[in-house]
Structure formats: structure tokens, C-alpha cells
Amino acid sequence: MFQTFVRFFTTKEVRNKIFFTLAMLVIFKIGTYIPAPGVNPEAFNHPQGSQGATELLNTFGGGALKRFSIFAMGIMPYITASIVMQLLQMDIVPKFTEWAKQGEMGRRKINNVTRYFAIILAFIQSIGMAFQFNNYLKGQLIIEKSVMSYLLIAVVLTAGTAFLIWLGDQITQFGVGNGISLIIFAGILSTLPSSLEQFAQSVFVGQDDTSLAWLKILGLIVALILLTVGAIFVLEAKRKIPIQYAKKQSAQRLGSQATYLPLKVNSAGVIPVIFAMAFFLLPRTLTLFFPKAEWAQNIADTANPSSNIGMIIYVVLIIAFAYFYAFVQVNPEKMADNLKKQGSYVPGIRPGEQTKKYITKVLYRLTFVGSIFLAAIAILPIIATKFMGLPQSIQIGGTSLLIVIGVAIETMKTLEAQVTQKEYKGFGGR
């Protein structure tokens, strides 16, 4: 492991990309401390302040929401917009479906529309959030309560989201890994110390016998280890489908090529978890604009992962998004076609349509197992807080852990691939 990190920093171009990525994430973190204009940063020191904040948004945004900073909206409007755009491509909007089939050019068009939609959504949610938080904090959040003040706050928060989208694009283009994922990753890690502090306080406060408190902490450590092992397994486990070559001349390539087709147990990675949590935020938008409407509050209460119905919905969403994105990441038809063109086949399976059906069947089974594991890891901390009396601060711990591990694994793979590429170029004398 140490030698791997040494390789990262001894390769100049990769080292520069790492430093660039870290610099962008530092800018993100600094922005979480810059308060939006016209708000009172001390308002969240109100006794009810921490309860009024949406813990998920605050965690993903690196604590920006509880400070009501310029990045208070975070990157979630973009993720929500991405969900909607992905669904609209499923023959709902013919133009989007057409773009999805146009390759790189089509993806650029879809990405542009996604960004515009995210900006509109961020503006709408910013206005509602300013009203809701000011009401919840008994009018202490907004200093000057005027239409212009609310509009200014909404514009600034929307600009903050737009800047984070741009920042993510810069990391993706000039840095290491997926920029949006790394921003969420950095946000979760930056809130970890405060979450641990809250957990420790909730465990020790009011305890005459500290042995029980230490037992809970030990239990949390063991649970974290088990969840980490489980997360790595579900994100990295593969099913190897054996491949054989029909042409004799292809035998010369066997020494340099894998003779199996690897399919991940969870091809979608942590995207289903992120999208499922983002989906839960949509009904809460109703309460931003209808704070006194009982029907809106009932919908928001139902769309809460900690409620009984909410947990079921959360699991169903994770499984649904896992299947959806598994077939986005893996195209059985294209895979079968490529195998046929290469003169290779799965033993006992005819090339072409039969191979496509076989890969589809295997992918369905793998995704079922992977999505169940994914959902279990995500909801176990919620169950622990609900039925075992553990503090609320660890409620989204499973979701956060999955995202952190998933992003870390993918970033490490990206770094290793870039280092290997540079080393091969070096051997080639370039």
C-alpha cells in the first residue's frame, strides 16, 4: 500500500492532478464557512437549530447547511436533476432518448440540459429553504425580511450550487476521479469529527456507569469494521464468466488477455444509494412551499428513511436504482456483439442472441444479491437508532460509509490506471 502511494507522488503528472484535486476540495471547504448575505450565522446556535437542519444535506455539503453558507444547497440539486434526466431518457422524452443514442455528442447535450435544470431546481429550493429555516428558527435567520433579501439569498445559494457543479467538472477534467463524487466524499469526511463528538456526548451524558457507554462505543467500532468489510465486498465482488476463442490465431493473444468476462456483483457502485437519498429530498420540497399544509407534512414524514414505511421505500429505491444503473453500466447486447466480433464465446452458449440472454440473466442475479447487500448496509444504522436506542448522529452512517468507501476505491483505481499509463509511456521512450 505504501509503495502504491509512493508511485502516485513520484509520477509528476499524477502528482499534479492530486494536488489540483486537493486544492479544489480546499476551496469547497472554505466556501462552507462563508455565510450567505443577509443571514445571521448565529441563528443555528438556537436550541432547535440543529434539529431543524436536514442531516443528509448537511453531511453531503460538509456542514454548509447548518452554517447557511453560500454552499448550503450543496450538489444535491444536480444529483436530483440527473435522476430526472435519466428517467426522461427512457422513451419519455423522444429528444432525450435520441441524444442518449448519439454517443459523446449526445451526452454533452444531456449534460448541458441537466446543468440548466439543476440551476432552476436550486433556485426554487433555495427560496423555499430560506422561508422554512427562517420560520423554524423563529425569524432569527433572515436579518432583513424583505422580498429582495429572500431573492438575494436564493441567487447566492443557486450560484453556490452552480460553482460546485463547475468545481466538480474541473476535478473530473484536470484532477483525479469523478468531481461530483469527490465533493460529496469530502463533505462526508469533513463532518465526521462532529458526528463522532455528538455520538460520544449522547453516549456519556446522563450515564452514571460509564462501562455501558464504553460498551456502546466498542459495539460501534465492531459494527463499523463489519460494515466496512461488507461494503468492500459488495462493491468489489465479481463473477468471472469463462471465455474461449474460436479462432486458432487468437490463441496467441491468450497470454496477454483475460480468458474470462468479469461482471461485478454491484455494477452500479454507490450511485443507487446517492440517488435513493436524493429522491427522499424531493417530497420535502413540498414542505418548503406549503409549511402549514398537513398533506405536505404527511408526505414528507412518510418520505423519511427513519419511518417504517420510509425504510421500505428506501430499500425498494436502492434495489430499483441498482438494477437501472447496472444495465446503464453493462450493456449485454453490446457485450455479446463484441465477443462475437472477436471470435470469442461463452462455453456452452451460442454467440449472439443466446450470449446476450445469458449475460442478462447473470447480471439480473448478481444485481439482486448486490442490491440487497447495498440496502442492508444502508439501513442497518437506521434500524440501530430506531430500535436499539443509539444516537441519531449515526443514522445515515451506513449511507455515508458506502459512499466514502465506494469513492475511495474508484479514485484509487483511477490513480493506479493513470500511473500505469504514464509508466508504459516511459518505457516507450515518450
Swiss-Prot record:
The keyword Phosphoprotein does not apply. It is found in: Cell membrane. InterPro entries: SecY (IPR026593), SecY/SEC61-alpha (IPR002208), SecY_CS (IPR030659), SecY_dom_sf (IPR023201). It is a multi-pass membrane protein. GO terms for cellular component: plasma membrane. It comes from the Bacteria. It holds the Pfam family SecY. The keyword Transport applies. One of its GO terms (biological process) is protein transport by the Sec complex. The chain crosses the membrane at residues 18-38, 68-88, 117-137, 147-167, 174-194, 217-237, 270-290, 308-328, 368-388, 389-409. Keywords: Cell membrane, Membrane, Protein transport, Translocation, Transmembrane, Transmembrane helix, Transport. Signal peptide: none annotated. HAMAP family: SecY. PANTHER family: SECY/SEC61-ALPHA FAMILY MEMBER. The central subunit of the protein translocation channel SecYEG. Consists of two halves formed by TMs 1-5 and 6-10. These two domains form a lateral gate at the front which open onto the bilayer between TMs 2 and 7, and are clamped together by SecE at the back. The channel is closed by both a pore ring composed of hydrophobic SecY resides and a short helix (helix 2A) on the extracellular side of the membrane which forms a plug. The plug probably moves laterally to allow the channel to open. The ring and the pore may move independently. This is Protein translocase subunit SecY.
